[in-house]
């Protein structure tokens, strides 16, 4: 159900005016409705958010992790609003009651059939140009994780049997093999 609804340009105000419970993202003035996530999607999101949060706590880190729904305004424009599945923000000045103003340091998107094109193409470009440092695409259907480290200009692919190192941290290794989804 992820589809664009018209050719004219929408703004953040149109997102705020959506009926209660209706989830959508705004990218370059186009509204994309979001299908409800599957159980497996939510399980992956919960597990990864928990691991990252525990790591930050154990290391007295200043970063904060947020799971969707969490508003991210990538830039100063009023025509882009996204809700990444997982956002890690290390600059407290970017955070306010509405969400995050500016690019998170690390974003994880968990692919669903309806979000595939957005996660692999549209958001990849938006996140890179906005200044996100690291972007993970977790694809349950393909049992793979694609890790983009924009600061290093690298892209690596892993499977659900691998341990994956987070680029923004020196020693955070997430072992997908022991995670039960």
Segments (PLM) and residue ranges:
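Gly/Pro/Ser/Thr-rich low-complexity, intrinsically disordered segments predominantly at protein N-termini
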Residues: 2, 6-181
């Amino acid at each position: 159900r992820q589809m664009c609804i018209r050719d004219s340009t929408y703004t953040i105000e149109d997102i705020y005016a959506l009926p209660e419970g209706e989830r959508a993202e705004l990218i370059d003035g186009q509204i994309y409705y979001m299908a409800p996530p599957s159980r497996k999607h939510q399980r992956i999101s919960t597990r990864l958010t928990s691991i990252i949060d525990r790591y930050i706590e154990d290391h007295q880190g200043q970063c904060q992790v947020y799971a969707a729904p969490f508003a991210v305004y990538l830039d100063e424009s009023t025509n882009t609003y996204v809700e990444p599945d997982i956002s890690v923000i290390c600059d407290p000045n970017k955070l306010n009651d509405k969400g995050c103003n500016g690019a998170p340091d690390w974003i994880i998107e968990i692919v669903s059939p309806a979000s595939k094109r957005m996660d692999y193409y549209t958001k990849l470009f938006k996140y890179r140009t906005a200044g996100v440092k690291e972007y993970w695409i977790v694809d349950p259907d393909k049992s793979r994780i694609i890790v983009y480290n924009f600061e290093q200009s690298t892209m690596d692919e892993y499977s659900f049997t691998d341990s994956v190192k987070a680029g923004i941290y020196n020693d955070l290794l997430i072992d997908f093999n022991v995670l039960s989804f």
